[in-house]
Design a protein with these regions (language model features):
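Rhodanese-like catalytic fold shared by cysteine-dependent sulfurtransferases
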Residues: 8-49, 60-108
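Short, surface-exposed ligand- or partner-binding patches at beta-edge/loop junctions that are enriched
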Residues: 52-53
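Short hydrophobic beta-strand that contains or immediately precedes a catalytic carboxylate
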Residues: 1-5
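Conserved G/P- and acidic residue-centered "switch" motifs that form tight phosphate/ATP-binding loops
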Residues: 57
Length: 108
């Protein structure tokens, strides 16, 4: 499992134990990480099955598309992401997502 969220998100929101971190974007302005594909290949390799996770599944979908186009044959997006979709009150962690499904996670 590769977490593509920013370092700040992982630190302040939580993370999946033993996940690998390769940020799709960096900082609070979410600037695209130009080294994403090289870092992903270095940390995981192109021949492995890769699950990508972000906050809601949107960035990880973009990352999965980019990785597939770059030759990562078995790359998948984790639907709903770590925090899930916004509910009718514009809040996450209420209706779906990794944490809502009570899957393992930690917070520093």
């Amino acid at each position: 499992l590769v977490d593509v969220r920013t370092s700040e998100e992982r630190k302040f929101v939580g993370y999946v134990p033993e996940s690998i971190h390769v940020a799709w974007a960096t900082g609070t302005s979410f600037n695209r990480n130009p080294r994403f594909l090289k870092e992903l290949e270095s940390k995981v390799g192109k021949d492995k099955t890769i699950l990508l996770l972000c906050r809601s599944g949107k960035r990880s979908a973009l990352a999965a598309t980019a990785a597939f186009s770059a030759g990562f044959a078995q790359v998948y997006n984790v639907l709903e992401g770590f925090e899930g979709d916004l509910n009718e009150l514009q809040q996450r962690n209420q209706s779906n997502g990794w944490r809502t499904h009570q899957l393992p996670w930690l917070q520093d």
